[in-house]
Regions:
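Class I SAM-dependent methyltransferase Rossmann-like catalytic core
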Residues: 44-70
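Conserved class I S-adenosyl-L-methionine
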Residues: 78-87
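A short glycine-rich, Lys/Arg-flanked "PGG" loop and its adjoining helix->strand segment in the class I
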Residues: 96, 170-183
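S-adenosyl-L-methionine
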Residues: 117-145
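A short acidic, Gly/Pro-enriched loop at the edge of an enzyme's catalytic core
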Residues: 144-154
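A conserved beta-strand element that flanks and buttresses the S-adenosyl-L-methionine
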Residues: 155-159
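Conserved beta-strand signature within the Rossmann-like core of class I S-adenosyl-L-methionine
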Residues: 184-192
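Core SAM-dependent methyltransferase catalytic element
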Residues: 237-260
Length: 260
């Protein structure tokens, strides 16, 4: 069609059609780019080795081996992540580094977090690595506001056992986590292993939980177990001593990945 020979009204209509087509194409390309970023694994080793990480976090690395966790959980740039029981924000910041620059990490803590942990978490928010971290001070059984939806990943690291002796409705909590994830989204939970048969009974005394008991609670909410990590396993652990304060001997820890 020759735009020069159009009437003014027709030309304007044609120009509007072209503009709409270009806008659709741009949006489509952005969406493809975002999906491609989410499907591309970042260099986790380089992120862990980043020179601006604190010495305190590097000390924690010695017993946590975060590279293994990142590979297992598989956070990607652009993802929306919820870190449950974020504490001082050690794992929250690691996740934030992996989803940057366009992703976001919500760090949930209940009201009444200890002052030291609270100070460490708030300090992270002021650093370049913490610019995509959003603090959520909310109860475990209502961990996210209504507008936080379609999450790609939820992490719940070494804190689930604490909810067994706190005034927390764990069934409600797990349903909320399920609702907050997008279809296909993942929930990764790590905790200290209790003996078979101990269930949730030693959460307060030994700070442990039986993996099968935890699994049952999560699956009741609708989740499906899709992976297990053995990189923190220590079969020599007798599982009859408290991990608080941290003992000077190996502790068996399980890591489970569930999917919505």
């Amino acid at each position: 069609m020759d735009v020069i020979n159009m009437t003014g009204k027709a030309a304007l209509h044609y120009a509007a059609m072209l503009s709409s087509a270009v806008a659709v194409l741009v949006v489509a390309r952005v969406a493809v780019a975002q999906d491609s970023a989410k499907n591309s694994a970042p260099n986790y080793a380089a992120l862990v080795a980043a020179p601006d990480r604190t010495e305190a976090d590097r000390q924690t690395d010695q017993r946590r081996d975060p590279l293994q966790l990142l590979v297992f959980a598989a956070p990607r740039p652009g993802m929306k992540v919820l870190d449950m029981g974020a504490g001082g924000g050690y794992s929250t910041e690691l996740m934030a580094r992996t989803v940057a620059p366009t992703g976001v990490v919500y760090g949930q803590n209940p009201d009444g977090l200890g002052e030291r942990a609270k100070a460490r978490f708030e300090a992270r928010l002021k650093t370049p690595a913490g610019q995509n971290i959003v603090s959520l001070v909310r109860p475990f059984d209502d961990p996210v506001p209504p507008e936080v939806r379609e999450l790609d990943l939820i992490t719940f690291l070494f804190f689930y056992h604490d909810t067994t002796y706190m005034p927390v409705d764990r069934a409600a909590m797990n349903r909320k986590l399920y609702a907050a994830l997008k279809p296909g989204g993942a929930l990764v939970i790590a905790d200290h292993s209790a003996k078979a048969g101990d269930g949730t009974a030693v959460g307060k005394t030994l700070h442990r939980i039986e993996d099968e008991a935890l699994r049952r609670e999560i699956e009741i909410a609708g989740f499906k177990l899709v992976g297990q990590g053995d990189f923190w396993r220590h079969p020599e652990d007798t599982r009859d001593f408290s991990i608080q304060p941290p003992p000077n001997k190996p502790v068996d820890e399980f890591v489970l990945k569930f999917q919505k």
